[in-house]
């Protein structure tokens, strides 16, 4: 014996296999608890479908409505929700330990913009040559970045050395 394929979405009309349902008519008015046969008749009279809205309730809540229109509205809601989602990107700002004040300000302005857009920022501090002898300068600079953006960003990944570079990740608050 083969089981019928499982449909996604709510059960409609004859697919509803419970003896009694709580019916809501097409105007949104509660009609009360009734046998499934009476609910199906009421839906047929209205020329609409009987759709199971809350299957887990006792008795299940069914509503008389146009199923095609209902599916369309649900799809529209899903699409709207998808549009509103913001994908958080990881932007990278590269610095050097002996960066000039103006250059730092330019980088800080970019970081500010990234945080306003809701993106995370990876601050990478590259050491070259003899700069490796003074990692404390790099740590000092990253702590300055951390302090400057303390109000609008939180540290997600504390500053630490990875090879010839020091990395810190900040996320908007």
UniProtKB/Swiss-Prot annotation:
Q: Does the keyword Cytoplasm apply?
A: yes
On assembly, the entry states: Monomer.
Read off the HAMAP family from this record. Answer: IF_3
Name of the featured protein: Translation initiation factor IF-3
PROSITE patterns in the record: IF3
Pfam families for the chain: IF3_C, IF3_N
So what family is this one in? Belongs to the IF-3 family.
User: Which cell locations does it reside in?
Assistant: Cytoplasm
User: Which gene codes for it?
Assistant: infC
Please name the source species.
Caulobacter sp. (strain K31)
What GO CC terms are in its UniProt record?
cytosol; membrane
The record's listing under InterPro entries reads: T_IF-3_C_sf (IPR036788), T_IF-3_N_sf (IPR036787), Translation_initiation_fac3_CS (IPR019813), Translation_initiation_fac_3 (IPR001288), Translation_initiation_fac_3_C (IPR019815), Translation_initiation_fac_3_N (IPR019814)
| Keyword presence, Transport | no
An annotated GO BP: ribosome disassembly
Highest taxon above the source species: Bacteria
GO MF terms here are:
ribosome binding; translation initiation factor activity
Function field:
IF-3 binds to the 30S ribosomal subunit and shifts the equilibrium between 70S ribosomes and their 50S and 30S subunits in favor of the free subunits, thus enhancing the availability of 30S subunits on which protein synthesis initiation begins.
Gene3D superfamilies the record matches: Translation initiation factor 3 (IF-3), C-terminal domain (3.30.110.10), Translation initiation factor 3 (IF-3), N-terminal domain (3.10.20.80)
Keywords in alphabetical order, please.
Answer: Cytoplasm, Initiation factor, Protein biosynthesis
């Amino acid at each position: 014996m083969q089981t019928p394929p499982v449909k996604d979405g709510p059960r409609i009309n004859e697919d509803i296999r419970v003896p009694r349902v709580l019916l809501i008519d097409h105007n949104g008015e509660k009609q009360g608890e009734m046998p499934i046969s009476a609910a199906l008749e009421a839906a047929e009279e209205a020329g609409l479908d009987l759709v199971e809205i809350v299957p887990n309730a006792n008795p299940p809540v069914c509503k008389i409505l146009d199923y095609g229109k209902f599916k369309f509205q649900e799809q529209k809601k899903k699409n709207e929700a998808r549009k509103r989602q913001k994908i958080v990107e990881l932007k990278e700002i590269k610095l050097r330990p002996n960066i000039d004040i103006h250059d730092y300000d330019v980088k800080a302005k970019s970081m500010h913009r990234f945080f306003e857009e809701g993106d995370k920022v990876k601050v990478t501090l590259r050491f070259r040559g003899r700069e490796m002898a003074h990692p404390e300068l790099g740590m000092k600079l990253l702590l300055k970045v951390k302090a400057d953006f303390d109000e609008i960003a939180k540290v997600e990944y504390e500053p630490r050395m990875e090879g010839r570079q020091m990395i810190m990740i900040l996320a908007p608050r």
